Amino acid sequence: MLSDNYDVIVIGAGPVGGYLAWKLTQSGLTVLLVEEHSEIGRPFQCAGMVNPSAMDRIGAFDTVLTRIWGARMYSPSGTEILIGNPDTTRTWSVCRKLFDERVVQLSLDSGADLLLSSKPINAT
């Protein structure tokens, strides 16, 4: 059941909003997370690229589709140019829907409330 009073209202239940709500609830604040859509992670907003430090904070490795270490480029003459290191992860490609859900779930598990299908139009 939703409260009538919150310390913080976070607008947008994407990865950043979910992470912010999680951290705020961990610090003891009451948080309402508001999302205009009826489902977390839909519609898709952007590609699912998560840098290693963010993934380490979230720990949602079960959402990873592939690891990206860099690229191999080839000149017209066939010379290979290596960008990055195959032994080092530069970014993770994730399933955005699952990743978004996982981040929001962290905030809910910490005590945040979630309000879906709600679009704020005014604040005082």
Name the predicted role of every residue range:
Residues 37-76:
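N-terminal FAD cofactor-binding segment of flavoenzymes
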Residues 67, 73-124:
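Conserved N-terminal helical subregion
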Residues 9, 22-45:
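Glycine-rich FAD pyrophosphate-binding loop
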Residues 28, 58-59, 111:
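Glycine-centered loop/turn motif at secondary-structure junctions
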Residues 1-16, 32:
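Beta1/beta-strand and adjacent pyrophosphate-binding region of the FAD-binding site
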Residues 19:
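Short alpha-helical segment within the catalytic ATP-binding CA
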Residues 13, 36-37, 76, 118:
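Fold-independent oxyanion-binding glycine-rich loops
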Residues 23, 54-57, 106:
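Residues within well-ordered alpha helices
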